[in-house]
Amino acid sequence: MKTNLISLAFAALLLFPINASADPDPNFHIYLCFGQSNMESGGRMNEADRTVDKRFLVMADFDAPNRGWEKGKWYHAVPPIAAKGRGICMVDYFGRTLVAKLPENVRVGVIKVSVPGCKIELFEKDSFQTYIDGERDWMKNIVKGYGGNPYQFLVDMAKVAQKDGVIKGILLHQGESNAGDKEWPNKVKGVYDNLINDLNLKPDEVPLLAGELVHADQQGRCAGFNTIMAELPKTLPNSHVISSAGCTTNDRLHFNSEGSREFGKRYGVKMLEILGFKPGESK
């Protein structure tokens, strides 16, 4: 009987939102995540994926009555970590990697906005409309779900999150649709600068982590773009490129479950290094 009560109490944690505090909690670390299809989903979940430390949270991007989610509130980050999502993505294992190493009093929260197939231009604050007007109808429908403006959707969610905690970093996975675009680093810098300004952040305190596309060692269809991505830190000083070498794929374009788990861990390890933790260092 006691075991059943404990199980019910734990289940309640998954269904009900985490209460926001009156003032932002400096030990609640928030990460903004955006991009295209690999940021959306990386493959099927297994039972182990559903075991998540209660200190890892996700802000509901949409209302999801079937999950008990209300947009703009925090929930235990059991995948899929998007109301309309499926499977897991790199963000799942990014968060898990952080909470496994950070002190017990630190929580990690993520906000995720992803539009499969989009160019980085979709997140350009002043010119996104021109871009989306020329895109395919299915993508326009996804964008409509974000109020017609995914960038502003991310900013609005982030402002809500800032009432609860502190934004510590930005995660990006995008580039397949910009393959060959040598201006991509400059475009990413523009999006980053706008986020920093619109959220009143300090650029030297908020790094951007950008992950490579499926690597050449996996015969990635867009692997050549990684040479362009490698230039990003020269354009955006507080940015870091995460290697995708060895991260597996089933179609040479999207990371599969195993690849997404490994890739997310690498994002997490890099962020821990930025926060001052050495590889293998315990809490």
Regions found by a protein language model. Name each.
Residues 7-17:
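Bacterial N-terminal signal peptides
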Residues 18-22:
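Sec/Tat signal peptide C-region and signal peptidase I cleavage site
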Residues 1-5:
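Positively charged n-region of N-terminal signal peptides that target proteins for export
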Residues 23-283:
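Cell-envelope and extracellular/periplasmic
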